[in-house]
């Protein structure tokens, strides 16, 4: 277990319990308002929330409605080793299954640079969302969502999330401009089965949206990781790294001996940020999804490596 300590007057923490898809906006809005009431100078917000069944775009929207769209949101949602059953969040001595917390930072000299990358490629014909409510998908291609999704994966409808999450990333097509910045044509999403054949999507999803099945490309995972680090280092030229937060998906790295080997991937992202031969304070977690900017906006990602470099 790794611990990163933060001290001083320029941060504050708040949390909530009972956050779900339907109330994600209201719960996050209440936390953001509490943060602002304690420190109106907050200019960046770290979030950790339950990852399995909330609407992450609603969380972003709530924070921005309080602090404005210029606030940088970074962090992740918690996972359970890709099982999609239950995840945990801890604040102080309280452990919850459907909780979230925010950490607001207000040091005017402290900045954060964020970026995410995945390295998966889209395959086959898209699934079309033909019926949805908020972040819940009811039908793909006019058929019960879970049945059609598992059929496209070559699995039976009795499969569970532990079977589908490692191989069933869905891709939303990006604009050409965003694809060039992202290094990929698609933004990935994780889905889980909750009630009947309904599926929980990671964000709100509109009817008519096309979603592609994807497959991991090991070479692309590593080349895009290198590209991301190079770009971040260029943007930070002349700056001093203070600390690094890091959120990562378990489905990334070298696939060997029926498991994912992460050591090489982690070393490739850490070494470029060393200062005088030493790694800066670095706190990483395996998550369900990651928050990082794309196209100048706060965006929720899945199946990525995301780095959040705090610097002065």
For the regions a language model picked out, list residue spans one by one.
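Small-residue-enriched flexible segments
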Residues: 1-271, 285-312
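Short FAD-binding loop at a beta-strand-to-alpha-helix junction that anchors the flavin cofactor
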Residues: 282
């Amino acid at each position: 277990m790794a611990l990163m300590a933060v001290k001083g007057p320029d941060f504050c923490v708040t949390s909530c319990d009972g956050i779900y898809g339907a109330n994600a906006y209201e719960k996050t809005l209440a936390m953001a308002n509490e943060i602002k009431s304690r420190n109106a100078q907050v200019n960046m917000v770290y979030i950790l929330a339950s990852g399995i069944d909330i609407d992450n775009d609603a969380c972003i929207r709530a924070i921005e409605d309080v602090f404005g769209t210029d606030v940088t949101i970074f962090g992740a949602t918690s996972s359970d080793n890709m099982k999609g059953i239950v995840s945990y969040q801890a604040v102080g001595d309280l452990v919850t299954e459907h909780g979230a917390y925010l950490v607001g930072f207000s040091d005017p000299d402290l900045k954060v640079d964020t970026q995410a990358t995945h390295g998966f490629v889209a395959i086959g014909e898209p699934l079309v969302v033909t019926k949805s409510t908020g972040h819940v998908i009811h039908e793909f291609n006019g058929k019960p969502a879970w049945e059609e999704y598992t059929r496209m994966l070559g699995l039976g409808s009795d499969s569970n999330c532990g079977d589908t999450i490692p191989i069933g990333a869905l891709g939303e097509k990006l604009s050409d401009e965003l694809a060039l910045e992202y290094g990929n044509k698609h933004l990935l999403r994780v889905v889980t089965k909750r009630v009947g054949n309904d599926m929980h999507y990671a964000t709100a999803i509109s009817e008519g949206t096309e979603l592609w099945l994807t497959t991991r490309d090991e070479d692309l995972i590593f080349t895009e990781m290198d590209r991301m680090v190079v770009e971040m280092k260029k943007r930070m030229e002349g700056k001093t790294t203070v600390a690094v937060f890091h959120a990562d998906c378990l489905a990334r790295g070298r696939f060997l001996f029926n498991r994912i080997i992460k050591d090489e991937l982690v070393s490739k992202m850490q070494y470029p940020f060393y200062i005088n031969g030493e790694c800066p304070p670095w706190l990483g977690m395996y998550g369900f999804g990651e928050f990082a900017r794309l196209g100048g906006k706060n965006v929720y990602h899945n199946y990525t490596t995301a780095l959040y470099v705090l610097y002065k």
